[in-house]
Every structure is written in C-alpha cells, then in structure tokens.
Swiss-Prot record:
The protein's name: Pyrrolidone-carboxylate peptidase
Described function: Removes 5-oxoproline from various penultimate amino acid residues except L-proline.
Alphabetical keyword list: Cytoplasm, Hydrolase, Protease, Thiol protease
Organism: Yersinia pestis
Enzyme Commission no: 3.4.19.3
Main localization of the protein described in the UniProt heading: cytoplasm
Biological process according to GO: proteolysis
Length: 215
C-alpha cells in the first residue's frame, strides 16, 4: 500500500498549541484513494527535527512527504516554493538553540526548490473556497530547516518521492491572543491539506500560471 507522510510541529514561542499538529494528527490513518496517511509530530528544534523526520521517512517509506508548519500572521494556506541553506533564528528553539547564519547542510547547495505541483495545489484549494497562495520564503527558522533537510534527502537518496512544505495560519483560539492577526478554522485547514495531498499525488507537471510576488 502506498503511504503519505505528513508532519506537524509541537508548540513553540510561548504558544499552547501548534495548529500544524492540531490538524495533522486528525489525518493519521486516513485512507485517501487507496493511499494511507501517516502523521508524525516533529520537535521544534534545529537538528532534532531533521532526525525525527528522517526516522519517519525510513519507517513509513512514503511516496509523498508534506511537512506542515505554523505561520502566525499569514492569512492564507501558503505553499512554499523554495528552502534556503541557512539557519538564522530570531528566537531560540525549544531546546534553547539559536543558530545565526549557520548552514543547514555543510557544502550543500544554496537552495532547493519544492518537489510539489504548488500552483496546481493553490488553484485547487482556492476553488474549494479556501484562501491559498504560493510563498516565496519559508523563513530561516525550524520550518525552513525542515524543508531544506527534507529536499536535500529526497534529492540525494529518494529521487522518486515528492515532498515540500506548507505553512498554515493561526487557529482562532490562538488569534485571540494576537489582536489583529488572521486565523483559519481547523476544518478549513484539514480540507486544504486533503486537497493538497490529492493534487500532489495526481499531478506530475505543475500548471504554467503566475504565482509570483513583486516584493
């Protein structure tokens, strides 16, 4: 049976919950068109997160890996285009580490592009009435760290496996502590992630439509 690995993070930065894990854990053992979804939680810690991710990939042997993370302040489901080879932490991770201008992989390439049909995924999610867009940066914190490490592994050892990263907004119960910050319901995020998986599994060549940004 084909399997999809989807990951979410533990809470960080003083939050009580992390929306990525709150939604992703609901998808564990879900069957979609003959494909089994396996959900795993990652620690919000440099190095440790990649160790946990690599262990999960070894265990699950997936055809698709989707890593999900919180992007407080963003209003859309944002599907990441690129990961860069740098850790530059504005705040410490959950183990107190705060790397500055450190490469994720020594001698690794400057960046990796996603292995997902991101524009087709954005279009499909929007057609379901859920705000979505292509993101040009995954940041320089643990989310980018995981995305880069994932793509490095897939490019080096699992070239047939699709993979990438999706950022999601706060849940409403978080946004009440961040006045003015946008949020999205867990149900909407769940629908968006199910669509993302379905489209990623079906589409081999992405749509040739705009998804860029002017800044």
């Amino acid at each position: 049976m084909r399997r999809v690995l989807i990951t979410g993070f533990e809470p960080f930065g003083g939050e009580r919950i992390n929306p990525s894990w709150e939604v992703v854990k609901q998808m564990n053992d879900l069957m979609m068109g003959g494909v089994r979804i396996v959900a795993r939680q990652l620690p919000c810690a440099f190095g440790e997160a990649l160790t946990a991710l690599n262990t999960a990939i070894d265990d699950v042997q997936p055809v698709l890996v989707l890593a999900i993370g919180q992007a407080g302040g963003r209003a859309d489901i944002t599907i990441e285009r690129v990961a860069i080879n740098v850790d530059d932490a504005r705040i410490p991770d959950n183990l107190g580490n705060q790397p500055v201008d450190q490469p994720i992989i020594q001698e690794g390439p400057a960046a990796y592009f996603t292995r997902l049909p991101i524009k087709a995924m954005v279009q499909g999610i929007r057609e379901a009435g859920i705000p979505a867009s292509v993101s040009q940066t995954a940041g320089t914190y643990v989310c980018n760290h995981v995305m880069y490490g994932l793509l490095h592994r897939l490019n080096q050892f699992n070239n047939e496996v699709k993979g990438g990263f999706i950022h999601i907004p706060y849940l409403p119960e978080q946004a009440v502590d961040h006045p003015g910050a946008p949020s999205m319901s867990a149900q909407s995020v769940l629908v968006a992630l199910e669509l993302a998986i379905s489209i990623a599994l079906q589409i081999e060549h992405d749509l040739h439509i705009t998804g860029g940004a002017v800044h």
